[in-house]
Each structure stands twice: as C-alpha cells, then as structure tokens.
C-alpha cells in the first residue's frame, strides 16, 4: 500500500513538473498588406512546437462580428492554466479589412494583384495548421481549393465551420489528439532536412547554364563547385577557358566573374585567375590609378556585392594589396552614398527605401570580402565595423518566423527569401570568424535557416523571391515588386550557398 502511494505521489510530482515546464508564448504577426496598404495581422498563443495547431479565420468578406468572439477566445486561452492548454492557437480575426474581392487559389502577380488572396494563401501555407476553423459564408473558393489542390504547395488542411461549439475552451482542451494535417506533415518534412540535403536537392536543379556569364546563374555554379561537381562545372566554363570572349558591360557580368574566382581557388586554373584579375582591373584607369569607386555601380547598393568581393578575391589570387585597398575605397564610397540614419541602406538615391536585397547585398558582399581580407590590412577593421554595424541595424527587423521583408522596415511587406538567405550567410560567416556575439546572432541564424527550409520545396520551388529589381522611384514601386512563387535561379543560388554554409562545407 505504501509503495502504491509513493508511486502515485511520484507520478503526481512528475506531472506537476511537466505542466510547470509548459509556458505560453504570445505572438503577433504582420502577415501582409491589402491593396490599400492596410495591415493584415494574426495573433497566436504557442505552447509546444509539436503540439497541434488550430487556426481560426474570420472576416474573408470584410468586417465580421465573429472577430470579437475570436479575440475573446484568444484572450481566455492566453490566461488559462498550462494543464488546460493542449494546442497552439492562431487567430486571423479580420482577414480582409478592406473587403477586397478574393480568389482562391490566387491568380495574378503577387502582391500587386489579388493582394489579400495571395497574402492569406502563402502565409497560412507556411504556417501549416492542423485544422482551420473558418467563418461560415462566402469563402471565395478557399475550402474547395484546399481540398482539391492543397495550400501553397504544402497539401490539405481540414476545415470546420465556425460555431458556438468550436469557439470554447472545452473544444481547445479536447483537441490535443488532433491529427497532423497533410500541410503540417510537409512542413515537418522540409524542416527535418539537413543543410547538405537542401544543397544537393537544389544542385540537382540549378547551375547548369552559364551561357551568359552573370551572377544569377553563377551563384548556383559556385554552389556546385563547393559541393564538388568540378567536372560538370568545367564543361560549363570550357568555352570561356579556351578563349570565348565576353564584355563586362554591367555589374551583373562583373559579379559573374566570382564563378571564375571560385574555380581558380579550387582548381588553380590560370585562365580563370586571369579572367578575375581582368575584371578587377576595371577599378583602375590607364595610368593604373584607382577610380573613386568601381565602375558600373549605378549608385545601387547591389554594388557592395557586385564589386567588392571580386576585388578581395583578386587580392588573394594575385597577392597584390591594391585590390584590397580598392575594395575598401569602393565600400566607403557606396556607404557614404547610401547609408541611412537607421543603419540600413537605401537601394539608390532615387528613393529612400530599405529594399530587401538592397540590404542583403551589402551584408553578404562585405562578409564575403572580409573572409578574404588579410588580418593585417590596415582597413580590415574598418570594413568589419561597417558589417557589424549593418547587421546590428538589421537584427531588430527579423520577424518572429526568422525572415526579413521586401522593405526591411515596412510592416506587412512580404517575407523575402533571397535577402534572408544573404543576411543569413553574412551572420554565419560572422559567427564562424568570431566577428559576432553568439548570444545575439546564433538564434537569429537558426531562425533564418528554419524559415528558409519551410519556404524551399524538395523540387526547388520557392515562396516569395523578389524578382529582378533595378532602381525604383518610390516606396510603392518596391512594395509592388513581383514575389515569385516557383522556381527561380536567383533564389536557387543564394539558398544553395546558404545551405552549404550551414553544412560547414
């Protein structure tokens, strides 16, 4: 009898400890913008990563009386004891605040057309609940689309109609055994991948065409070189290595020469080295004097990546410090032109907008350059200060899922994958080299990598890769840039290299 009582007591203590260890995290998301630039938000109470997730969705037709009911449910749930909290809860109480006409699955260019439809479709997909409780009424094909094709490439999610019985604490308490949705299973499958697996999956798709020697396909070719596919890449580069000429007529071709820098580093090929030095020599006039900045910068922050790493790699390949000197000269020039008071970079002087890749380029470009810089170079610490200052300015703008956004400091602009990969690579190199504090940046890196995996399918489909973007005249123009949902060479190269960095290769 005593043994039985002791066993019961131990069981009760262990359960108390287990319940005490459960704590709620209250979250809020700026999930997107309406066509009128009004914010669409979600709120959540999250307990355990692996607990079932229920999403309540109201207001597809516009303002809804059920919004108050759902907000009250959320508040009650946030104040409940841990023993009552069996599921993660997300509420989108006012999904369509401007009463736009919706269409599911969405058509048109995201997010300038059918804005709200695209926002909801992609955001709900990347958060993959196990059950959606949907307000009754016109759903614009949402339920049918989920059943017939699944959501945003993740798969199906069961739907229940909102009712008095499923907006209670009792309903939430008894949902702890809710089955995994197909969408959640796909999300888990994506996040379970190792960095090497992601890199290899992308290397099977991207990096097979260098007929135009520009950086967009070039980044995937660099990734494939890093993964060891040297013979295959040799075949791609052979026309240039045996004398086929090309003109470096723009910054994209200039940055494409990074392929030859990586090829020279790995293979020692002298022709590749010569192509790198030939491109880097564009920094100097006919008297071998440095220009104020590298040509073809077009006053855009892209140039931190398009030119600076090439100069640093030329310095390593040649052993000539003038390339390092020019790298810092160019960086200082661009920084003076484009740095904003908040530590972010405007994309160009034409619009004071902190565009996503317009900040990814400086972060990644300087990290790449610093990885090549001699520690004894007198300007190295200056460039390192530029990078650290920029990353410190970027860090507060990482969202709770791990992403940076199309306009870094504009709430509700879309979560953009290429810039997140580039900033992630800068942070990874900063941590590996001891430039950044582990406590601040390691969690940010892990969040970014997890978010990237969620938005990268097994067959190389990406969610929200900003299309090619030159100088834009206004904030509106940047907010309306196409967010690609599909295969994309630019995202393929950046995400592949991020995966390789995360794999430590």
Can you describe what each PLM-predicted range is?
Residues 19-41:
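Short glycine- and acidic-rich boundary segments immediately preceding or forming the N-terminal edge
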Residues 193, 301-302, 312-408, 413-424, ...:
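Extended ligand-binding clefts on enzyme/binding-domain cores
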Residues 41-50:
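Short beta-strand-to-loop junctions in surface cap/lid or active-site-entrance loops
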Residues 1-5:
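Positively charged n-region of N-terminal signal peptides that target proteins for export
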